[in-house]
Each structure stands twice: as structure tokens, then as C-alpha cells.
Amino acid sequence: FLSSADVPKPKDVLGHEIGEDYFLASYEEAIKYLKVLDESTDRMVLLNMGKSTLGKDMLYAVVSSEDNIKKIERYKEIARRLSLCEVSPEEAKKLAREGKAIVYIDGGLHATECAPAQHNIELVYQLVSSEDPEISSIRENVITLVVFPNPDGMTMVSDWYRRNLGTPYEVSPLPWLYHKYVGHDNNRDSFMANTVEIQNLSKLIHHEWFPQILVNHHQTAPFPARIWIPPNSEPTNPNVHPLIVRWQNLIGSRMGAEFDKEGKDGAISRVHFDTWYPGYVTQVVDSHNIISILTETALYRYATPHFYTLRDFPEEYRDLTISAFYPSPWKGGWWRLRDAVEYVLTASRAVLKTARDHKEELLLNIYKMGRDVIERFKKEPPYGWIVPEEQRDYPTAILMLQRLNLLGVKIYRANEPFVSDGIKYPAGTFIIPTSQPYGLYVKNILEVQKYPDLRKYPSLWQGIVEPKKFEGAPLRSYDVTGWTLSYNMGVKAIPANTPLKVNMSPVKEVSLKPGKVSGTGSFYILNHSVNNSFKAMNRILSKGGEVLWTKKEIQLNGKKYPEGTILVPVSSVKRNLIEDMAKELSLNIETTKEKVNGNSTIKIKKARIGIYQSWMANIDEGWTRWVLEQFEFPYESIHDSDIRAGSLNDRFDIIIIPSQEPRSIIEGHKLGTMPPEFVGGIGEIGVLNLKDFVEKGGKLLAIGDSCDFAIDILKLPVVNVLKDVKPDDFYCSGSILRVECDTSNPIAYGMERESSSFFEYSPAFTVIPSYGKEGSAKSVVKYPEDSILMSGYIHGEKMLFNKSALVEAECGKGKAILYGLSVIHRGQTHQTFKLFFNSLYLY
């Protein structure tokens, strides 16, 4: 491409070419260059979408022609009105002719996949500086947003690489997550939007810019391909307009043609990456009528080059046989960061050329898709979802509605009582109609998922003349198969199967009703079924107040309260603290003047909590920290050296081992693969110290894969019945399952006896009757004897019948609690948070 002489190149500012061997620009360096560029041209503006988790300004570039930049607010308004279907068909045609295509392109969400973020710098430079007619016409017809979705991670990776450059550890993995809390799961958070980065992106996409195309670049191509591009693999999520799939295929084909035109071999499609799960940055927008494009470029490690021969290839690729979706196989050779950057640039340019060539059609299509969805759900169910204000956990129900609203969903409230499907609802009830532009997203998130068993549908995924039925184990999904949000969050949300006939008004902002304290007396009464009550308890305990839980059902003020009801002696805490918490946390707190028998309550105390943080960069550990911080549980991270040092009871009452493969807990990174301070796990001495900790009265909480570790080292009378089971016999990669809770056990206080839970390659247990010195174990949560699946997919569910999902086991003076269920899965499973939180106190 031709460049304007006056525009500074990246090397002029950074001292390096983008993609140069052994150089990774940090986020700060990228922004330094873009600020210089911004000052040098009127073809771009640099905008701020908010703060990252670590407090960095999340800046993004908007690139177009000089005239378009001047009228940017007008083009945003056109995109918004078309996306939200706020105009007539005739007006839509006029706006489409006037408007510009808006294309969102990001790179660096997964920070160790370095090329996409580096490409961002070069892409902005090329779009701003080139006078080539191809680029000039893109600027004239397209507004391009170039986004860095993980600034913190981009700098973490750059710093780590520079630290080890030229040492034996040059290509070592990071020993910590490249996002403070969630690491790789930042691309699994898009519908829940727990992280501030995803919240910022959601506001940008669904409330400000309303792009017609979203491109999310990654760098994990199926080897030896050099880049993966659409079409996607199967299964396809059913809650997308057919035009989305058609345009994904069209754009993918345009990309493939551009790669071959430029002599860039190795583009592959229709393998590995499906579109089922809406937690990705890409798939979450599909049901918002935005065409999502994923790419996955090849990666060695960081900016270090690598040479490949055919001997490195999997056997089926060594003879370079072509296929319909891999017509120009890569033959091997050197692979450098600059090569990967060039491939990503080609992909981005292909998208922008397509947007340029079809600008008016794209703008009309997003309008057409929205109108189609509106009309469809005027005529067929589900007509929407009804969310009563009366909930077991009202603040969590409001949180669910807030997250839907953040993702662009319109929420309404009934102005008067109404009837739906024979059920009476009062005024004030929340209503989420599907007859709105993003109605498919509503359906996608709130309906029950039924994941297809691909063995039954060979024609979906076998591109051969005569598809063959597959008789082996279930074909694995790329990610989880069921995510029904109301089930995971424990919110009552009822589908409307008949047309909604109700006078309702839109809710501008979904917010909590302030709670209040009623009456005076000797005890405050809090509801254990409300997750915000744990925030309240933690604040009370931190101020030196007292907290009691009732052991059994109790009658106070002429009313019955269930076991686990929270009582706070009025004399132990200032009333203004209680009133402020009630208002902020939406807790309706009652009081009682009645006396309470001390033998009928449990006094809980604040515990000293340690969370094991392996140098293996454990995503579940990060989510555990995130959840604890949201609910104000104080904790301390502990590492291998802390556990090896022993005397754990002097520092901690409770130690949490997040889900991690047992061997990696003990062995960690191998010698020579990492700098010495990050090598090795807790070792055998650490195993002995953890055993000593429990036997002397400590509490060990093991989650997921770590349960086998706890069972083995503590010799618990518990068996993981799924430990060595093959996928032919049992498979469940991420589904919502029915469980039964023993609500007489303090661990299950606040739970309903029948509940939903999340299962993701989880263990399940049988308890062995034990009469020895090791102590006994008891089931707290178990799977019923039939009808386990609530949403998703499970193969071999009989293996779970009457098996335990959560076990409490005694060991010496202490105990271990085994969480087979995914109790805090990605910060989504508010329904089961209580099972975790109840174990984080001393009682």
C-alpha cells in the first residue's frame, strides 16, 4: 500500500517494526503510537470506553474518511435506529443509503495470542496513511473501530516475554492469569458480563455504535493450518437469523480468496470452532443480528520464530492433500510473528472490503433481521419471559435483568395486573418480550438448551458423498452445552406460551428497590436465601458484630422461619449500619423482641481464608477470587512455598483448593521449563502439611478436579465414581442438572431442597460407611434417581443417579468439603453460591 509521507510509521515511534522477531509492543506502547497518529491525521479519533480491571484507560481507534469523522454522531444514530428497528421500511432504505457500514475489529482478548493485538497497531496505520484506492474507498464507506479488549493482559505478556528474552525460559508460559481474575475465560463471559472489560465492550457495541459486523481475532489455528476462518463447524446455535450464517460464510469465503490471491497458504474452515455457546465475544452478538467473524491464526510462542517441517505435522496432513475447506495446504517452513500479523491484516482487510462493497445491504440487513424477529414472535411462542418481583432472591433477579439490559435487551414492567397462561401476575411484574429486535438473544439465554447429539446427524458435519453414522463416544462440544440463565442464577422466569396481553411500560434503568429495617427488638432477622445477606454478614462480622444461624425451623413474631435463618443481636451492631446495608443491598430486615434459645442457634465467626494459587495459572482459582471479592469475603492467596513451609493452622482456618488436576498441584511446572521460582508444586512435604492442617482442625474446601486430590491425601471414605470412566459410558461437558439438598446441614442453609446445579466434567461421589479414626463422611447435595438433565446434554446419566455432588467429610479434628458440582462456574451460578459461602465461616 502507498503511504502518506507525513504520517509517522510505528517504527518511528516504537523503534521496532510491528511483528519484528523478539519484539512485542505493550498496550502502553500501542497507545503511545496511536496518540501520535491521532495528532497527525483527521482520519481517526482515539476514544475511551472505560477502565480495565487494573485501571488502564481502554482506548480504541475510530478510522474513516475526514468527512465521515466529522459526521460520526450522525452515522452512529443511523446505525442505532436501523439496529433497533425504530423506522419504517421506507425510512430504513433512505438511512441505509446515507449511512456507513460500521465494523468492529478487536485483537488481543487472549493476550498470549499476540499477533492480533500487534496487528491492531499496523491496521490503524495502514487505514489512516494509505492512498491506495482500495483503502481510500474503505475509508469512504466504512467506519472501522479497532479495539484492544484486554489491555492488562497485553502488557502482562509483553513484560513477561521481555523478562525472559534470551534466556532458557524465553517461550515459557505465564505463571499467572493474563487477566487478573479470569484469564482465557474472558472469552466465555460475554452474556454474563462479569468482567469490566466485557461490560465496557457491551456498552460500546449494544448502546453506542451498533456495528453490522464484529471481528474477533485469535491465534490458535488447528495445526498445521496457518489461519482458521469461517464457515464454522457444527453444531450451529438455532437462535440466529439465517442471514447471519450466510454472511459469515460469504465473508469467510472472501477471506479465503484474499489469502490465496496473496499467496498465503494454509487457510482452513469448518473444523474445530462451533457457534453453540453464546459466551464468546463473537456468538453473543449473532443473536443481536450482528455478523460475527472469528479468526484463529497460527501461533508458535510470543515473538520467537520457529521452523516447521512435514515431520512436525499430524500424519493426515503430511501428504498435503487438499480439501474443499483447506484447498491450499501450508507446506511448512519458518513461522514468525510478522507472518501471523500479515495473515490477520489480510483477514481484516477482507472484511473491510466486503463491508465497503455491500455497505447499503449490510445496513438494510440488520434492519430486516430485527424486523423479522419482531414479527416472528408476534405470531409464535415463546412470546417472552415473565419475571415476578416476588423472588427467593430478589437482588439476584434484578442482577439478571440488569445484565440482559446491558446486552441491549428491552425490559418492561406491567402497569396493572394481568394473566398469562392462566397465571395471575400483579402490577410491577417484569416482562421481557421476544418481539423485539434482540428477541432471539432473549430466547437464546433464557430457554432450555437441547444440545444435538451429533452422532445422529452425520450430514451436518461430514462433508462426504455418503455420510456415515458414528458409533463411538459422543462427539465433544467445544464448550458447555447448557446455560439457561434463570436456572443458573436461581431466578423465577416463566416463558409466555400465549400472546402477552398486558399494559406495560419500558424500564429505562433496572435498579434495586431500597430495602428497609422494620420495627425494634433484640434481634435483626435476615433471609439466608438472599445472596446479598452474605455481604451483610461479612460487614457485620468485620465491625465486631455477632451473627447466629438457627439450627431448625423457628417461630418468631407469629411467623415460621426456616432453618438457617440469620439472627443478629441488636446490641452487637449499630442500627445505622444495618439500615444502610438494608437500603444498599435491598434487604428487608425484620426485628423480633422474642428471646431465642442459645441451643437452637449456631454462632458463626469470621474465618482466616487462604486460596491456593498455583503457578499453573488456574482459571478456576481466578474466578474463586472474583466471587469472594464480590461478596466481601476477606482472603489471602497462598502459593506452593507457603504450603511447603507448613504451620498452616497458625495462618488459616480454611484453605480452598480450586479445581486443578491433582498431579499438577503436587508437581507444578517441570524443572527447566520456567524460571526457578515458579518450578514445582507443593511437593510431598506440602501434601503432608495440608493433611496436618486438616487433622489439627482446619477446613479444606476442594472444588472439581481437586476433589480427587483431597480424597487421596486425606484418605477420605469417599469414591469418585467418574474418575476413570470413559466418554463411551459417561459424558457431560457443561450442563445444568437437578440436585437435592440436605437443608438441615449448615452448608445448605438458604437452599431449596430441590435445586439446579452446574456440571462440567465434574466428579460425583459415593460415601463409604466409615467407623475408623479417619472419621465419617455425609452427602450434603446429591443427584436424584431420575430426570437429572435440566438444560444441555448428558450421556450416561444413570451413572449419576443417587450419587453425591457435595460431600462433607471429617478428618481428625478438621474436615474436608468436596464440591463435585461447579459451584461458582464462571461467576454465573448464583443459585449455588450459598453452598460455597456457607462453608467460609467458622461454626
Where do the PLM segments sit?
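Short, solvent-exposed turn/loop segments enriched in Gly/Ser/Thr/Pro and often Arg
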Residues: 146-150, 161, 216-224, 706-707
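Carboxylate/His-rich catalytic cores and anion/metal-binding grooves
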Residues: 124-127, 131, 139-163
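Intrinsic-disorder/low-complexity accessory segments
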Residues: 1-114, 118-142, 182, 188-189, ...
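Active-site-proximal cap/loop segments of hydrolase catalytic domains
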Residues: 154-179, 183, 199, 203, ...
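Feature marks short, surface-exposed loop/turn motifs that line or immediately flank catalytic pockets
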Residues: 152-153, 221-223, 301, 663
